[in-house]
């Protein structure tokens, strides 16, 4: 019998404002995520706004996979608080460097991952609609689920696996490498 595994994916999206001569994907991504988060807060719970906060009590985001924290390794505030929406379904919608990204909630099988990935696509559609309502036609935001913007920036979709924190890093490398190859 197979051991149940917690899994999920993170999908990176390309973003562009096609009518602008100069692109600022960080700003456009921030507008997109914030517009969706603000709309979701105001339309939830009978119109009473509330925010799901990111809890770092059991997290050390500055640590690498070995658990080491180099001096000055704290993530920028923008990666942890400013443009980061934890959604009601457990997914996360955020700006990852210079593009919008959605991570699924923890899932119990591949079918559930696919369902949440599809719901992420719908969230992006709604986010574009809400953001574009606040922008001029020249500032329209368009998001693509692809893997390259044609200017050297590439995007992707990556898997996530739950691993016990007590597992030695060398064991992860030994077994994960075999699994991925």
Residue ranges and their predicted role:
Residues 166-172:
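Inter-helical turn/loop segments and adjacent helix faces that build the functional surface
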Residues 147-164:
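Histidine-centered divalent-metal-coordination microenvironment in nucleic-acid enzymes
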Residues 1-144, 153, 173-181:
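Terminal catalytic/cofactor-binding subdomain
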């Amino acid at each position: 019998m197979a051991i149940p595994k917690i899994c999920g994916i993170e999908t990176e999206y390309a973003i562009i404002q096609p009518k602008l001569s100069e692109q600022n994907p960080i700003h456009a991504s921030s507008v997109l995520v914030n517009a969706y988060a603000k709309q979701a807060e105001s339309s939830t719970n009978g119109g009473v706004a509330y925010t799901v906060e990111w809890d770092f009590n059991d997290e050390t985001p500055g640590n690498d996979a070995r658990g080491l924290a180099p001096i000055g390794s704290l993530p920028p505030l923008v990666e942890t608080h400013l443009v980061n929406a934890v959604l009601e379904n457990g997914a996360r919608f955020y700006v990852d460097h210079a593009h919008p990204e959605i991570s699924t909630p923890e899932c119990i099988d591949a079918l559930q991952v696919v369902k949440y990935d599809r719901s992420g696509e719908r969230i992006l559609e709604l986010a574009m609609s809400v953001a574009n309502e606040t922008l001029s036609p020249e500032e329209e935001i368009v998001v693509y689920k692809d893997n390259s913007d044609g200017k050297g920036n590439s995007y992707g979709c990556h898997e996530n696996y739950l691993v016990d924190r007590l597992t030695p890093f060398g064991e992860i490398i030994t077994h994960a490498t075999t699994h991925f190859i």
